[in-house]
Amino acid sequence: MLSRHINYFLAVAEHGSFTRAASALHVSQPALSQQIRQLEESLGVPLFDRSGRTIHLTDAGEVWRQYASRALQELGAGKRAIHDVADLTRGSLRIAVTPTFTSYFIGPLMADFYARYPGITLQLQEMSQEKIEDLLCRDELDVGIAFAPVHLPELEAIPLLTESLALVVAQHHPLAACEQVALSRLHDEKLVLLSAEFATREQIDHYCEKAGLHPQVVIEANSISAVLELIRRTSLSTLLPAAIATQHDGLKAIPLAPPLLERTAVLLRRKNSWQTAAAKAFLHMALEECADVGENESR
């Protein structure tokens, strides 16, 4: 049995069709069907029920699918381990982050990592925490950066920093000279907030409801860069991590009293899985970068 057989089996199981699976795999349907028959013969059981218009996994197929998926993950990890070089002269690293981190944290971190290890190929994606956790468990990512708590027990969360939400305004805003702003002032502020699909917005809404706050949300945006540009050009304000303001000219982060929301940023990785030298180096640099972010916030 070859890894090709496993890969073909999982593709047919996922697509529910030999035709669609063959197209996704870029092989002919007869060749795919032949490989599946060889696999079934080697296992001694039919894996697919072909009696109807659509194909379905048999009971044996359902059971074997779990093991096949894990086997393919382990084979992939083994291949990466073989090519892993301890001196970090080459290798690859697959990273995903939730959106707020692209505005202040991940840029400097990736730049520093590339400067130190130019032979490492980096793949960076921005996505929801739910998707990050799912892809980590499927071994389609090496590391993720998101927030505690973690929802899947297969994952390990390493604390990086505590992120505070602040009132972010332009330098010309009337409140820019304030050292802090009372939470009750949010009733009077006209806000630009991230749209509902962002975890940050969900957390803000939940906290405001719990605290009896009813801020005036006059603009919603599905892009952090759009929010920041609107803040720069208007007298509106927003609620975002305080560290974002330190990375963008013309903005001021004003602490809220009492604090609106604090959350712990974490680096996520799969438990008990092979950690490449690149992944270990990335964790080390992330912790260094977080220490610098903490120092900047305290100034």
UniProtKB/Swiss-Prot annotation:
Residues of the DNA-binding region: 18-37
Any Gene Ontology CC annotation: cytosol
Record-annotated HTH lysR-type domain positions: 1-58
Subcellular location as annotated: Cytoplasm
Superkingdom in the source lineage: Bacteria
GO molecular function: DNA binding; DNA-binding transcription factor activity
InterPro entries hit by this protein: CynR_PBP2 (IPR037403), HTH-type_LysR_regulators (IPR050950), LysR_subst-bd (IPR005119), Tscrpt_reg_HTH_LysR (IPR000847), WH-like_DNA-bd_sf (IPR036388), WH_DNA-bd_sf (IPR036390)
Keywords on record: Activator, Cytoplasm, DNA-binding, Repressor, Transcription, Transcription regulation
Family statement drawn from the similarity comment of this UniProt entry: Belongs to the LysR transcriptional regulatory family.
Function: Positively regulates the cynTSX operon, and negatively regulates its own transcription. Binds specifically to the cynR-cynTSX intergenic region.
NCBIfam families for the chain: PRK11242.1
PANTHER family, per database record: HTH-TYPE TRANSCRIPTIONAL REGULATOR YBHD, NITROGEN ASSIMILATION TRANSCRIPTIONAL ACTIVATOR-RELATED
Protein's UniProt name: HTH-type transcriptional regulator CynR
Source organism (scientific name): Escherichia coli O157:H7
